[in-house]
Every structure is written in structure tokens, then in C-alpha cells.
Amino acid sequence: MNKQTLKAIIFAGLFAVPLIPFLVSSSFFFPFITTKAFAWRIIVEVIFAAWVLLALLDENYRPRKSFMLYALLFFLGVVGLSTLFSVDIAKSFWSNFERMEGYISLLHLGAFFVVISSVFREVDWKRWWNTSLAASALMVVYALFQLAGVIVIRQGGARVDGTFGNATYLAVYMLIHIFITALFLYRSRKDSTMRWVYTLLILGQVVTLYYTATRGAILGLLGGLLIVALLNIRNKEDKTIRKLSAGSLAAIMLLAGGFWLMKDTNFVRESPVLSRFSSISATELQSGGRSFVWPMAIEGFKERPIFGWGQENFVYVFQKYYQAEMYRLEPWFDRAHNTYLDWLVAAGLLGVLGYLSLYIITLYLIWRTDNNFSHVEKSIITGLLAAYAFHNLFVFDHLISYILFFSLLAYVQSREENILAKNIRLPELWVKRVALPAIAILFLLQFYFWNVKPLIANIYLIEALKSIQLQEFESAGDYLAKAYGASAAGRPEIVQHTANNAIFILTSGIPLQKKNEFYAFAKSAVLKEVENHPNEAKVELLAGSFLSATGLHDESLMHLEKAKSLMPAKQLVYFELGALYINMNERLKALEVFKTAYDLAPGYQEAKIIYLIGAIYAGDRVLENKLITELSKETIASDARIRSAYSVVGR
């Protein structure tokens, strides 16, 4: 395999990367995430293997020495150590199908950075960024079709989400591309045709960003533009830019002031986008999810300050510091919804410093005097970093934003001139006869274990869920067992769906032998999951619910009590525990448990309903009448569980 062939493979893979955001397949579980992630990993592994051979053959394609490379290696090293010392190593390395992150993804990002920064020259970067901008133009068109109602918005509501299935993910994609487009607009300012092309593209990107209604990204854009304008207000290189910057500053100030004056008008209140900004208040901030999970993250950091808990282990912090008042929010958080706090929890102080160093060194490299970025280009890249950094105060990163961020880092890195090990030359024959076979074997092994097996597990899982929807329960049981055996990656989700759907399969009309086989598999898988994650409340709760549903009350009680000890403020645990006591005909114990759940947060209506049900079963008429007065007649009449309780006690 010669150098030209290797270069062709690398370039083909790199130019395929901007198309990854469009990949969505219903054949995969979490199609908006896993389709993109598996394609990304395969591409990176192929180009990295080809690059290693190319770098061995030609010293010109070896990494460039710079602070950026060393900072990235430090960051990867720290997160690697945090993975080794994490609460749950498997979670930290593999992540899950819903996120597809973990240390495995960080390794792929590092490999991508090394490859693209080593092989691309300025002309290649121009083509690659323009390919990415062309892709963003297609995404704009897709989003406009969503606005027009031609294409369905997958997450529901009015916020466009493109092919991401999440408006926030689309927002940061557009945010980054707006600044990249501005960079090329400036570079093409003397080309009237391209000037119009880039201007129209920016308008489309801004409109798309606006209709994602993502506050952090929109405010990040305004803040980033403000920084660009401030940095150019005294630009000595270009008088026109100075005037434009002054005008931009005035426009941003007028825009902010005008919105403030109009925030209580019907026009703003009736706008699905503007109303999200006018509704920002101290009350909203105090009652929202971040007001709970951010302090949790700080407490988690205090407990493990050096290397953190490991990626994907926020769940342990969440369960430990959970507050009963969080019943209003989604039941489980796996992120702090703040990138910096997420890294603080995942990799400790060293990890977050490593992450922040990537921003700092990028700024250092572009603003130092011995590079060939113009003042305007420096300010645009600075504005991009500022906008992205602000956006990340309110969200967590995802694959595509990581790819774009690491691409920017690599772009800055590629301008460095000092090449590592430039004077070391290896015989071509040795590379072909020794290095090539060794790399091929390693590539095939990791390709099989990192991609093929997880892919098979993912496909089996989605086939199982489709079979359940079609009530083909025998096939569903077989697919779940196959998914579990295919790979360790994604296994928590496979076990979760196995446990949640077990009762449907076991009470269906499939042959008894098949039921017994599935039951044996399901019980073994659930208990193995508990063994692999011994201190995770969510897993203990899952096991307790499964064992209760299958009639193993004593075993269920053990796991539910463990879940309660791990997460004493979680009402859902008490609901399951109380239901178990009712099934065990220990109704007074059930009432006591339901009372505890109710007392945790008396304003929680679901807890009040469950408490009423407990009172009905326990025959406590005084308590029953008291709780009935606290609930509306419509609530009582429409709740099948209340009617069922009255039926069971013969009333």
C-alpha cells in the first residue's frame, strides 16, 4: 500500500465527517445518536490506521509539536486516569447507547485531532471547512422545511431540530458554523459572488438558530459577536472593519435594550421563541433542574476533587444528593447540564483544567505575533470560542459539537511548523512487512469489539422493541437475549428493557418452554446487572420492580430496601416498596411507606394519590377522607388505581 493510496483513504474519510450529522436510521436504537456515533467511530478508526502507516513512511505527515498537542495529551491522560479510578469503569469507558460518549469516544476525538492536524494543509482546510459549510446549508434547508410543516419536528413542539432530534444539538451546530461562515466571508470579501453566498448562508444559519429557541446558544451568539466587535473597535488593519464593529456594537445594544422594553408586550409573550427569553427570572432559575443539579455537582466534586467520579458516573452523585422537591423534574439526571461542572464531576479539578486549557492555548496560539491570522480572523475565532463557552454553561456537549470543537483545535494546531520525530526514517520494506500486518490485526480486533459487537447488540435491541410493539413476544425474548450476549456496550439499557417488558412476555401466549427460557435469562441478566453496579439505586430499583412483578417478593424487598438506603429522598422507590407490601398483604407497612413518600414533599400530587390508595387498602377511613378533600373529584374519578383499590377492598 503506497503513500498515495493511504492519503486517498484518509482524505475520503475526513471529507465524509461533515456529512455525519445527516445520518439517522430507524434500524438503530436511539437512531439520532447511535447512527452518527457508529459511523464516526468507523471512519476515525480507518483513517487513523491509514495515518499511522503514512506517518511511518513519510515524516511530513507526523504530528506537529505544540502546546495544543501537549494540552490534549494531558487532558486525555487525566480522563484516562479518572476512568481507571472511576466508580464504574465500564460506564466510564463505554457510556451507553443514549449518549455514545465515554472514554472510547474521547479516544476517537483525540485520534481524529492527530490525523486531521497532521495531514491537512491550508488548502485542504479551506475545502474541508467549505464542505462543512455546505452541509450546514443543507441543514438550514431541512430546518426550513420543518418550519413549513413539510418535515416533522421529531422532538415535538415548535423548536426545529434538524436531523439531530434535539433542538439544542442543532443550535450549537449552527452557532459554530455561523462564526466559521463569518471567517470565510471576511476572507472572500473581494469576491462578490462568494460574499453573497456566505452572507445568505449566515442569514439562513441565524434564522435556524433562532427557531431552535435555544437560549444559551442565541445569547452565546450575541455575546460572541459583541466580543468580535469589541476586539475590532480599534482595528488598525482595516478602517471599514472598525466602522462596522462600532455599528455592530450599537446594534447589539439597541437589540438588547429594545427587547427589554418590549418583554412584557403581547408580541413577545405570543412568540414561541421570544417568550422563552422574557420568561427568564430568578424564580425560574431557582425552580429549574439546574438549580438542583449544579449544587449536586459541586458536592460531588468536593467528595472526589482530583480525578472525579469518571465519565457517565454523575448518576452516583445524583442519587446521593437527590432532594425530594425534584419530583417536578425528570426522574433521573445523568448530566449536570453544564459542560464545566460535568467535567468537574467526571474528571475532577485536573480534568476541568485540562479541558479549559484547550480554550486558553487556542487563544494563545492565534493571538501570538508569529502566526499569519489577521486581526479580524483572530477576533472571529475568539468570538466563536466565547460563544461556545457561554453556550456550554447551560448544556452538555454531544458528538457533533465535540467534532466541530476538535476540528477548530486541529485547524489551529495544523499551522504549527515543528514536526515530531522528523529525522527518524524507517525502511519502507519494514513498514510494509512488519507494521502493516501488525496494524491490520489491531485494527480488525478493535473494529470487531468496538463496533461490530455493539452494533449487533444495538440492532437486536431495537428489533426486540419492535417485536414487542407488534406483540411478537417470542421473537422479542429471543432478540433481548441475543442483544445481551452480543456486547457489554449498551448492556444497562438492554437489561432495563428486558426487565420493563418481562411481564408482557411472561404473560403472553408463547410456549411454556420459551417463557421459562426467557425468565431464566431475564432474572440472570437483572441480577448480574446489580452485581456489576452494586451501589446504583436505579439498578436496585429496576431489580426490585422486576422481582416483585415475577412474584419473588422476598428478593424484591432486599433490592428495594437497598435502593431506599442509596436514595432515601426518591419517592418512586417508596411507591415500589409500598406496592410490594400490598402484594405481600402487609397493608399497614405499605401505608407507613406511602406516608414517608408523602411527607418528603406534601405538594407532590402523585404521592398524595398513592398515599390515598394506601389508606384505602389499610382501611384507615379518617386518613382516606382527609386525603380525598385534598384531591379534586376529577382526579379521584379518573384514576384507575383508586378504583381498583376500592374494588379489592370490596367498596
Question: What is the predicted role of each segment?
Answer:
Residues 460-651:
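C-terminal luminal/periplasmic domains and tails of membrane-associated envelope-modifying transferases
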Residues 2, 8-27, 41-52, 72-85, ...:
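Alpha-helical transmembrane segments of multi-pass inner-membrane proteins
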Residues 159-160, 224-225, 243, 256-302, ...:
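Flexible juxtamembrane loops connecting transmembrane helices in multi-pass membrane enzymes
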Residues 1, 60-65, 236, 371-375, ...:
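Membrane-interfacial, low-structure loops and terminal tails that flank and connect transmembrane helices
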